Amino acid sequence: MKRRDFLKKSLLGAAALTVVPRHVLGGPGHTAPSDQLTKGIIGVGGMGRGHYGYAGTRLVAICDVDRNHLDAGLQLAGEKIAAYHDYRDLINDPNVDIVHIATPPHWHGIMSADAARAGKD
């Protein structure tokens, strides 16, 4: 390789790094998207809304059988996220890495087992 070609390619590579937004690469004050867990919350009544803002996670889906809770949960999210009435649809969503279950206690067992079978943490 000629020195001129080497310098051109080196400069192009260095310039490309300055074009990439900071939030994509991570670093101080920024988490790269690949280092962030995406989560879904099943049950977005009073308890479920407390699960919205955990560090290192990004909310991508919510689920509730009560339409009023679901609508309020979507408003609280403040961004476009998936909304489901059936928890099985949420746990089968390929965009969801982890699931928070904030339903009445008698539902936790079956939902946890189904989430584990679907490969969700």
Predicted segment positions?
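N-terminal glycine-/serine-/threonine-rich beta1-alpha1-beta2 phosphate-ribose binding loop
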Residues: 1-121
